[in-house]
Curated annotation (Swiss-Prot):
This is Phosphatidylserine decarboxylase proenzyme. The gene is psd. One of its GO terms (cellular component) is plasma membrane. Is synthesized initially as an inactive proenzyme. Formation of the active enzyme involves a self-maturation process in which the active site pyruvoyl group is generated from an internal serine residue via an autocatalytic post-translational modification. Two non-identical subunits are generated from the proenzyme in this reaction, and the pyruvate is formed at the N-terminus of the alpha chain, which is derived from the carboxyl end of the proenzyme. GO terms for biological process: phosphatidylethanolamine biosynthetic process. Catalyzes the formation of phosphatidylethanolamine (PtdEtn) from phosphatidylserine (PtdSer).
Length: 214
């Protein structure tokens, strides 16, 4: 759905192109300081928009992390769609993480909702309710609903989500990204429990985020 181009997130290509072109222009004009700054920006953009292939685990009854980052919150919170209290796992992404987001499970996108908001630091609790965010609900073959929320942060003000209601996603499949660092919240369906700890590093599409209770 959201396939990379030459190992890079497609939404990053225009930004990389602008910095690369600026580097060339400044070099031709013999403006070394600006050429150096543009070159460093190009290198940073290449690193930021990298989108490596991942192999997801195949065992049943699990959900994988939708984002690279660090687990910044575990607990209960109201599902932004239904209002039900659910177990929630929050993953904070900094500017050095891969920022492409992946589906935690195989299922059908049953709902997509964009919610405008503010741009507080994404590590704050109020970011879940006050910040700009995009919500998708992925319903698996057993009817379990996973609510995944992309949250814009203090720096990241650009949420990308081409997924739409009716689309089918595979576990670990790319479905969007948030530019320049932010946060992903996953509201687990009843019967699933977190399989990660506070402060644990996660890898999108690989780290087992939650497991179904026996």
């Amino acid at each position: 759905m959201y396939k990379p181009i030459c190992g890079l997130a497609r939404d990053g290509l225009p930004i990389i192109g602008v910095f690369a072109l600026a580097t060339l222009v400044f070099a031709l004009l013999r403006w070394p300081c600006l050429a150096t700054i543009s070159l460093l920006s190009t290198i940073f953009s290449f690193n930021f928009f990298r989108d490596p292939d991942r192999t997801s685990p195949t065992e049943n009854g699990i959900a994988v992390s939708p984002a690279d980052g660090v687990v910044c919150k575990l607990g209960e919170a109201a599902d932004p769609i239904t209002g039900e209290m659910r177990q929630v796992v929050c993953v904070f992404m900094n500017v050095f993480n891969v920022h492409v987001n992946r589906s935690p499970v195989t299922g059908v996108v049953s709902e997509v909702r964009y919610i405008p908001g503010k741009f507080f630091n994404a590590s704050l609790d109020k970011a879940s309710t006050d910040n700009e965010r995009n919500v998708i609900v992925v319903t698996d073959a057993e009817g379990a609903r996973f609510t995944v929320v992309q949250i814009a942060g203090l720096i990241a003000r650009r949420i990308v989500c081409p997924a739409k209601a009716g689309d089918t996603l595979s576990r670990g499949e790319r479905y969007g990204m948030i530019k320049f660092g932010s946060r992903l919240d996953v509201y687990l369906p009843h019967g699933y429990h977190p399989a990660v700890a506070m402060g644990q590093k996660t890898m999108a599409g690989v780290t087992v985020l939650a497991k179904k209770a026996d």
